[in-house]
Amino acid sequence: MLNRVVVQGRTTHHPELTYTKKGTAILRFSIAVNGINSTSFFDCFMKGKDAESHELMGKGTEVFIVGQLMQRRYKRKNGENSFKTEVFAEECNYITFSDYDGTGQNTARNEVIHSG
């Protein structure tokens, strides 16, 4: 079965880096993707060295993500089991937009500054 996600959006908050009991880094963040009529929000995560290398990603950073959908089970505070669908980001590219080039001209420069 095919499970592939490609999405581009802006981070909605600073990412949260945690470690599992075995020492694996997990980076969690959310992105907002503007659609034609509405904005969609996706919770994302990365694992391992990629997670550690993206820890400095800030709120509002535009990212291009390639990955897959994953579902995890967790317990709510009231004890009920619940499920959450997230994007496991296998690749995360930062994209920057510069709207001022120092000459008084607005530009729409687009460059990849990190690929993980």
What are these regions (language model features)?
Residues 51-52, 70-72:
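Histidine-centered metal-chelating micro-motifs
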Residues 70, 76-97:
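OB-fold/S1-family single-stranded nucleic acid-binding modules
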